[in-house]
């Protein structure tokens, strides 16, 4: 077994599988934080909550799990052609499935390297009034707690796609 920062090479798992902490929503109150297993000190409402997978009352490296492929396990392509009275339509498609990508930089951290804030951070970040948000609380790059640097499933997204590589209509 070989563990990198957020990937793992382990027998029986895909090569370079994602090996991450499991995000479990966000803390919504100081009371919830006081009754939870947290990472370090300084945890505030709106911060990412992590699952304690091994139930040892602490969040540590043993709470990471394999949670997706870095490399697609399925690659496919197909084409078709239809003809009618001298008119022909043909297309070629290509895609991949069962692959995950990890967002980083300004997508996962507002104000990254002096950049601005994406619209999603302004509209979809956690606030005391919006506990059902898609993103954690908005913070500056230097104001981010250490626990936000933990590589976790909050920023893991499905990267499967199907694209039309060629579309041709002829007469």
What are the roles of these predicted feature ranges?
Residues 10-17, 30, 39-45, 96-171:
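Extracytoplasmic gating/loop element in the C-terminal half of outer-membrane beta-barrel translocons
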Residues 1-69, 130:
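Conserved small-residue
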Residues 61-64, 73-75, 149-156:
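Glycine- and acidic
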Residues 83, 94-96:
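Outer-membrane beta-barrel pore domains and translocons
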Residues 81-85, 170:
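Structural signature of outer-membrane beta-barrel channels/translocons
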Residues 86-91:
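Repeated loop/turn-to-beta-strand initiation elements of outer-membrane beta-barrel proteins
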Residues 73-75, 81, 143-146:
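Core subunits and conserved enzymes of cellular information-processing
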């Amino acid at each position: 077994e070989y563990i990198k920062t957020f990937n793992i090479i382990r027998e029986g798992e895909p090569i370079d599988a994602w090996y991450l902490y499991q995000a479990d929503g966000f803390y919504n109150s100081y009371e919830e934080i006081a009754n939870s297993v947290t990472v370090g000190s300084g945890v505030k409402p709106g911060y990412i909550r992590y699952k304690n997978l091994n139930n040892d009352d602490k969040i540590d490296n043993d709470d990471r799990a394999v949670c997706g492929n870095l490399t697609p396990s399925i690659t496919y392509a197909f084409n078709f052609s239809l003809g009618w009275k001298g008119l022909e339509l043909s297309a070629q498609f290509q895609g991949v499935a069962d692959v995950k990508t990890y967002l980083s930089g300004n997508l996962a951290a507002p104000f990254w390297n002096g950049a601005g804030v994406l619209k999603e951070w302004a509209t979809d970040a956690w606030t005391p009034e919006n506990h059902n948000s898609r993103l954690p609380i908005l913070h500056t790059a230097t104001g981010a707690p250490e626990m936000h640097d933990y590589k976790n499933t909050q920023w893991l997204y499905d990267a499967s796609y199907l694209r039309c590589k060629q579309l041709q209509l002829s007469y």
